[in-house]
Amino acid sequence: MMKLKKIHNLLYILFLTFFTFATVNASDDESFRPPGRFVSIGFQTMYIDCMGNKSPTVLIDVGIAGSSASWYKIAQTLSNNVRTCLYDRAGYGWSDPGRGERTTATIVHELNLLINKAEIPGPFVLVGHSFGGFTARYLAARFPKNVVGLVLVDSSHPDQIYRLSALDKVKQKPLVTGRKNLAPEDFSEFERKWYFLNSSRKATLAQMGELKYFKESAYQVKHSGPIKDMPVAVLSRGIGQLPELDGVSLENEWQDMQKDLLKLSRNSWHLIVADSGHEIHREAPNRVVENILKVVNKSKNSAK
């Protein structure tokens, strides 16, 4: 009986191995080839997809465990008016795993190499959702001549670790874009494939690395220096996501930090999207598009 059980377990393992192998091979099938480009930055290959050809270039970065696929329709809409680029951070989607600590400084270094190797023309309007807001801010501070506008979508704040420290007292989901079990129903087959790539082992390791070094990333962003006076749109959620603990409304703390982002520039504005939670780009895409184009237009007027 024990021998039969061992054989059964062995067959089950072999089946899982075959199923995994078949799934991996399916991802290499030409029908799943993405429309963008694979670009070598020397020590790894990264994926980027740019649409449209009008300046400036809108460059979008997502939150931890987020998916570029969830921004695809927004990118397509924007491309009618402006060049728009989506990319996969190291370990996400079709990009190779990254090297070193997964801090914002590392991410921006890789992104800058990608921009140069892919010969993506500036200037840039940077869009950052959640943790991607760190990328946008750090890049703007480090390369001020190339960045003409920012759009921060329910962005992380460098002080959130301390101002939301009460969350350590309870079990809770990380303050990042959560990965759902199923892709959104309105995703195309291509977008679903992109989405599920972020459930792979390499993507999970990338997400864990970014969470591990979140504190270092926050420090880097806070001390990256001021950005030049440019159009900055701050979009924040209207539907609360955080509890009240020890008599403190953590959601109010979050909103206060969103308002604090207005200090980045004298040419900034704040929009609370009343009917949206954290994933504003999914729940209110038109508001995101409107504000990105507003930043684009203001950046053009400033350049005159």
Regions found by a protein language model. Name each.
Residues I60-V62, Y87-R89, V153, S236, ...:
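Alpha/beta-hydrolase
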Residues V151-K180, F190-K193:
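Flexible "cap/lid" loop of the alpha/beta hydrolase fold
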Residues Y12-T20:
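Bacterial N-terminal signal peptides
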Residues D49, L86-V127:
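Active-site loop/oxyanion-hole signature of alpha/beta-hydrolase fold enzymes
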Residues R266-K304:
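Catalytic active-site module of serine/aspartate enzymes centered on a nucleophile-bearing elbow/loop
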Residues D186-I272:
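Conserved serine/cysteine hydrolase catalytic core
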Residues S40-W94:
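Conserved HGGG/HGGXW glycine-rich cap/lid loop of the alpha/beta-hydrolase fold
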Residues P121-L164:
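Conserved hydrolase catalytic core segment
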